[in-house]
Amino acid sequence: KAADEDAKRAWRATLGREERQRSSVYTTTEVIVSAFADERVRSQTEDPSYTPPRLLDKRKNTLYLCAPLQEQERLHPLFSMLVQELLSYAYEKAAIKGALDPPLLLLLDEAANIAPIPDLDAIASTGAGEGIQLLSVFQDMAQVGTVYGKRAATIVNNHRAKMFGAGISDRETLEYISRVAGSAEFEQRSRSRAERGRRSMTEGDTYRDLAPANVVREHKPGSALLMYGALPMAKLDLRIHLDTRR
């Protein structure tokens, strides 16, 4: 198989490396393949019922990758590899036949833990044109920065829609929402009373933040703020996922 030949060439190239480089390659490889020490992992990945072409065969197919909290770190190299393999095939297919139809929904819940994708910023900016709809879920902006460093802002900006749930306590996230929402001009009136009882009123304009950090933090559970493209920010009431009413 072509994949086997690629693996053999990579192995021969590794053997020819300087000893310290070879040691580094071995260490990285051990981390990546450690998940395959689990018999359950080997049996599932050897199952021929899943391949990227079969998943994208125009039928209503779904691939779930999930792991309990204590296994996420061990399995995330495997999960990342599976997602990147799928994306590579999806981009190749789109390059030949045009945007995927039906499109591929790539839903990355706990995107920083389950299957961190190295080039998430590029996928966020180019995926839509190839028929790939990307939904990334992070706990807060701080988590994005921890995983992706300087590319964190690019990743967030490349997602056209951004939704923020209630109860946010991360300062960076609150400041981001307030800064992007901006401010608006409001009419302000003030009344005063002189010592002899005379009253006066003054009118003027003032600028106020549209989404002050404290107001965003105090949003009730079940609500969210939506930023979409150049549209004004909107407040949403969320529907419980078990509620199937239309």
What is each model feature region?
Residues 72, 113, 141, 170-171:
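Alpha-helix N-cap/helix-start and coil->helix boundary motif
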Residues 60, 121-125, 143-246:
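P-loop NTPase motor core of the ASCE superfamily
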Residues 138:
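H-loop/switch region of ABC-family ATPase nucleotide-binding domains
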Residues 1-132, 147, 206, 211-235, ...:
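P-loop NTPase motor domains
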